[in-house]
């Protein structure tokens, strides 16, 4: 099976959802809210989830969906529900044929709430299951930095398709990723990338558009002949990865370049196209289990670009255990040629 149709629908669904998330940012988040006000994220999360699940339901009605949000909050908060509906109801791709493929406009606010609730699958080892993160990188979203709309298809626990929209990443693969990438990008000119992969068929990127799908080009991780020259990509939030341990791993490997800090699965996408080399997400809490929607699409995109993705013990990520990566601890992603060396350094630092 080729999975080309699944990839096509996933890309269009993600693309349409990013039209909403950018609208929410510009109307609700930009310069008007304190960082403690989560309502723009809430609105974007629920709205993007509704739009993407609608597209999956229209094209693959029997597939299951694992998503983060449930509509019970909205059924209790009528004002919030009405505001989300106001923003969602007119969102469409400018290309009519592409938009119809996704099911067109949602018919009503009630239909929107019902469809949000279709993301409650428990996951597991059998069947076709979509893992959806409507806004990955909530703090990045609020500060106008990096966030991603992420969708992956699992079949019998194996990731077959991944699509990630990064509205604030530069389209140019060769663009220098500096520390400023994490703030105030505001989907400026030259920003907005859609990454995707099919298992066994490589990874591609294309510019995000508001209409039909743009032309793609294949992407791959860059060779790292000297590990000391490698560049780390890591999270901005200290609560998501143990940054002191990350620094110790870098030191052990002789890496002196400053780490690039960015939110969301944009980290997976950045190393997949050679704008960085190593992504570490080292455990902060002993009992924390990573959510499958935070990793499914990025895991495949990196592997299909010539990388390897494992946990801190060197085990591949197991997406068959339900809604979390219950069998894994942490994440280490790097080019295949240096993965063992990175894992070895991680084990030394974490005393595994």
From Swiss-Prot:
One of its GO terms (molecular function) is metal ion binding. The keyword ATP-binding does not apply. The active site is at residues 45, 138. Keywords: Hydrolase, Magnesium, Metal-binding, Stress response. It catalyses: 3'-phosphoadenylyl sulfate + H2O = adenosine 5'-phosphosulfate + phosphate; adenosine 3',5'-bisphosphate + H2O = AMP + phosphate; adenosine 2',5'-bisphosphate + H2O = AMP + phosphate. Its EC number is 3.1.3.7. Mg(2+) 2 binds at residues 133, 136, 294. The keyword Magnesium applies. Induction: Down-regulated when grown with elevated levels of potassium chloride. Mg(2+) 1 binds at residues 68, 133, 135. Belongs to the inositol monophosphatase superfamily. This is 3'(2'),5'-bisphosphate nucleotidase. One of its GO terms (biological process) is sulfate assimilation. AMP binds at residues 240, 264, 267, 281, 294. The lineage of its organism: Eukaryota, Fungi, Dikarya, Ascomycota, Pezizomycotina. It comes from Emericella nidulans (strain FGSC A4 / ATCC 38163 / CBS 112.46 / NRRL 194 / M139) (Aspergillus nidulans). Mg(2+) 3 binds at residue 68. It holds the Pfam family Inositol_P. Binds 3 Mg(2+) ions per subunit. Adenosine 3',5'-bisphosphate binds at residues 138, 240, 264, 267, 281, 294. Its cofactor is Mg(2+). Phosphatase that converts adenosine 3'-phosphate 5'-phosphosulfate (PAPS) to adenosine 5'-phosphosulfate (APS) and 3'(2')-phosphoadenosine 5'-phosphate (PAP) to AMP. May regulate the flux of sulfur in the sulfur-activation pathway by converting PAPS to APS. Involved in osmoadaptation.
């Amino acid at each position: 099976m080729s999975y080309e149709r699944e990839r096509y629908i996933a890309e269009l669904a993600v693309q349409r959802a990013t039209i909403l998330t950018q609208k929410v940012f510009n109307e609700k988040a930009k310069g008007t809210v304190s960082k403690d006000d989560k309502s723009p994220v809430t609105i974007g999360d629920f709205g993007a989830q509704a739009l993407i699940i609608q597209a999956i339901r229209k094209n693959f009605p029997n597939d299951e969906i694992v998503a983060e949000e449930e509509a019970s909050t909205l059924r209790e908060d009528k004002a919030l529900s009405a505001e989300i509906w106001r923003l969602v109801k007119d969102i469409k791709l400018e290309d009519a044929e592409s938009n119809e493929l996704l099911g067109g406009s949602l018919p009503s606010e009630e239909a929107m709430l019902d469809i949000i609730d279709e993301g409650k699958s428990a996951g597991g080892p059998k069947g076709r299951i979509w893992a959806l993160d409507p806004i990955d990188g909530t703090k990045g979203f609020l500060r106008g930095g990096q966030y991603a709309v992420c969708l992956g298809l699992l079949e019998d626990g194996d990731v077959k398709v991944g699509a990630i929209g990064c509205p604030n990443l530069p389209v140019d693969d060769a663009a220098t990723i500096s520390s400023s990438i994490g703030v105030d990008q505001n989907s400026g000119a030259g920003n907005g990338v859609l990454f995707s992969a099919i298992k066994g068929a490589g990874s591609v990127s294309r510019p995000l558009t508001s209409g039909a799908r743009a032309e793609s080009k294949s992407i791959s991780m860059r060779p790292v002949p000297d590990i000391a020259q490698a560049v780390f990509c890591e999270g901005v939030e200290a609560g998501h990865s143990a940054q002191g341990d990350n620094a110790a791993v870098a030191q052990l490997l002789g890496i002196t370049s400053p780490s690039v800090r960015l939110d969301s699965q944009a980290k997976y996408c950045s190393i997949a196209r050679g704008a960085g080399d190593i992504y570490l997400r080292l455990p902060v809490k002993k009992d924390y289990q990573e959510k499958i929607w935070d990793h499914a699409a990025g895991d495949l995109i990196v592997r299909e670009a010539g990388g390897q993705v494992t946990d801190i013990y060197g085990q591949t990520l197991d997406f068959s255990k339900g809604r979390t990566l219950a069998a894994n601890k942490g994440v280490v992603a790097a080019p295949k040629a240096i993965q063992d060396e990175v894992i070895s350094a991680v084990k030394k630092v974490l005393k595994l």
